[in-house]
């Protein structure tokens, strides 16, 4: 395997939370936003947008932290067998950690774009996507000689946040509907603290256990075990910090 395979493997791994969270949010949010906007219910649209922001962040940020902190055990469990050597797993994990930084941005795009689509504006997001694509290509080509194959992953991550920046700036014209408010910012801060707490716990756990994972079977079992530990740690910190509860997620993902 070479650079293309490494990037492909990392892409498959971070696409899992992106697909589950991003698509679910988009499917639920767009019809609800459209309904409120058509009815002239600005407050309802604002609440729907705020709720989608909180839920998407609550699901994507801990996933990004985990992919950044413990990418190698996750990659090893999935890919380190057959023709994929340890050096390949390390390279895939490196790309995965870079992509993890952009994961919240990719999911935020799924939250922000429905604001435009609900107003029947598809041209503006398309124009922003073109700008982000130019940034992506420019960085990938410009950094290739300096950084090698990881330039592609870095370019993808940077361009994802550039796209979010364009969408946030453009959404100002939607007024209060596109704002999360002080309460929303406090909730996002508590979610971030819970995710960082989870990340610290996973880092410590992996530091103690990694040297004992020396067989294929243990590698396969170790990755899912860390995922389960991360879920439990995040749930604990989220509960202690009053960040978000399963009931909050259920209400947010339920169509009204």
Locate each region found by the language model.
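Membrane-embedded alpha-helical bundles of multi-pass transporters/translocases
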Residues: 1-256
